[in-house]
From Swiss-Prot:
Residue stretches spanning the membrane: 18-38, 48-68, 93-113, 119-139, 177-197, 234-254
Gene name of this polypeptide: lgt
Protein name per Swiss-Prot or TrEMBL: Phosphatidylglycerol--prolipoprotein diacylglyceryl transferase
Residues that coordinate or bind a 1,2-diacyl-sn-glycero-3-phospho-(1'-sn-glycerol): 141
Pfam families, alphabetized: LGT (PF01790)
InterPro entries listed in its UniProt record: Lgt
Role, per record: Catalyzes the transfer of the diacylglyceryl group from phosphatidylglycerol to the sulfhydryl group of the N-terminal cysteine of a prolipoprotein, the first step in the formation of mature lipoproteins.
Membrane topology: Multi-pass membrane protein
Main location: membrane
Biased composition range(s): Low complexity: 297-309, 320-335, 348-375
Coiled coil: none
Enzyme Commission number: 2.5.1.145
Single GO biological process annotation from the record: lipoprotein biosynthetic process
Domain of life: Bacteria
Length: 409
């Protein structure tokens, strides 16, 4: 005697004028919207565009539905290709019959196409989408309740589901284990675990999605053992049970492969999106030229127009790729000391000996000085990198007389 039971809906279709609205399809649609909403919020929290969730859903949902239907038809061929089956029922998806494994495989393929198209990491997106996906599955399971299908063994528990006579597998037995309710509750627990783990622990890329697969398949394993609907078996076990075992082991193996808390292959942008690394502030580009102030202080005011042109070029105009003076180069502006030159009175005058302030009579030297004044790069640095011709030095002074050209024999 059953004292209490969960009643089943009297019908699973609501007509909005001439348009039939099936509760099974409505549950799927609501689940998709919830998944997109949750995924979008998680992407925004990672510094990514929340609209990426919608863009990927445009690809993942159709592929997921097709994959789910294909898996169901392949795993239960007698209902469509058997003696009492009808091949045309294959396309009647509104009557129910979607395999979750096909949905995951097809949806993953569609998501892969979308992420590849938009240049997004599939593993990174999967981690963000995992809690939303499992919530969508929890909502979608109520479609089985509206269709009065995929329930468990006969039961007299107070939370057993009551099935109408035309949908009963065992004639005369009206109450069964509500496997749809069990899976819904299990999925909600998994969603909570994923959110807590993701908040308290920084897993490597793709690991949160693997954890979702492992937890879901573990729950699906014991739920499948309660079902009594017709299904193909291998070694006395339903095909879905074997699938759950294989997929669960594969997910656990994927979790164990990478032991480091952070995937070393993560780019800086992905680390910042995951919250592993903080965004670096934009650093001001400041180039310090050694010896610039000293040289300007030591150079006489009568150094000539070339010196004035150089003084008009500030240190900010120095090419950061070429850098400052080269300490190893004796012709560098920052490394050449001032030379002591005796004057007519016997005193010693300090004369700057940098190549850029010397007055030369040759065209090549003048061109080099003009280039230095234009680009703001010291001549010594240009010489050390082969960008300018090194000027000959005599006794620490720059000679104003060009060297004699060798006579050809």
């Amino acid at each position: 005697m059953v004292l209490a039971a969960i009643p089943s809906p009297s019908r699973g279709v609501v007509h909005l004028g001439p348009v039939p609205l099936r509760a099974y399809a409505l549950m799927i649609i609501i689940g998709v919207f919830v998944a997109v909403f949750v995924t979008g919020r998680r992407l925004r929290a990672r510094g990514m565009d929340p609209m990426v969730a919608s863009e990927v859903a445009y690809w993942a949902v159709p592929f997921g539905i097709v994959g789910a239907r294909v898996y169901h038809v392949v795993s239960t061929p007698a209902a469509y290709f058997g003696r009492d089956g009808n091949v045309l029922d294959v396309i009647k998806i509104w009557n129910g019959g979607l395999g979750i494994w096909g949905a995951i495989a097809g949806g993953a393929f569609g998501a892969w196409l979308a992420t590849r198209r938009y240049g997004i990491s599939l593993a990174l997106f999967g981690d963000a989408a995992a809690p939303g996906i499992i919530l969508a599955q929890a909502i979608g399971r109520w479609g089985n309740w509206f269709n009065q299908e995929l329930y468990g063994k006969a039961s007299t528990l107070p939370w057993a589901v009551r099935i109408d006579e035309k949908h009963q597998i065992i004639p005369g037995v009206s109450t069964y284990q509500p496997t749809f309710l069990y899976e819904c509750l299990w999925n909600l627990v998994v969603a909570g675990i994923l959110l807590v783990v993701d908040r308290r622990h920084r897993l490597g890329r793709g690991k949160l999605f693997c954890l979702y697969v492992a937890l879901y398949t573990f729950g699906r394993l014991w739920i499948e053992m309660l079902r009594i609907d017709t299904a193909n078996q291998i070694l006395g076990l339903r095909v879905n049970i074997w699938t759950s075992i294989v997929v669960c082991l594969g997910a656990l193996l994927a979790l164990a492969v990478t032991r480091s808390p952070v995937d070393p292959n993560l780019s800086r942008e992905e680390q910042e999106a995951l919250g592993i690394a903080r965004s670096r502030p934009a650093a001001r580009s400041t180039v310090t030229t050694a010896g610039t102030a000293d040289q300007r202080a030591a150079a006489p005011d009568s150094a000539g127009p070339d010196s004035a042109a150089l003084d008009s070029v500030g240190p900010d105009s120095v090419d950061p790729d070429l850098g400052g003076p080269d300490p190893a180069d004796p012709g560098s502006a920052g490394s050449v000391p001032a030379a002591a030159v005796p004057d007519a009175s016997g005193s010693t005058a300090t004369t700057a000996t940098t190549a850029t302030t010397a007055t030369t009579a040759t065209t090549a030297t003048t061109a080099t000085t003009a280039t230095t004044a234009t680009t703001g790069v010291p001549a010594g640095s240009q010489q050390s990198r082969g960008l300018a011709t090194r000027l000959p030095a005599s006794g620490g002074h720059t000679s104003a007389v060009p060297p004699e050209e060798p006579q050809l024999p």
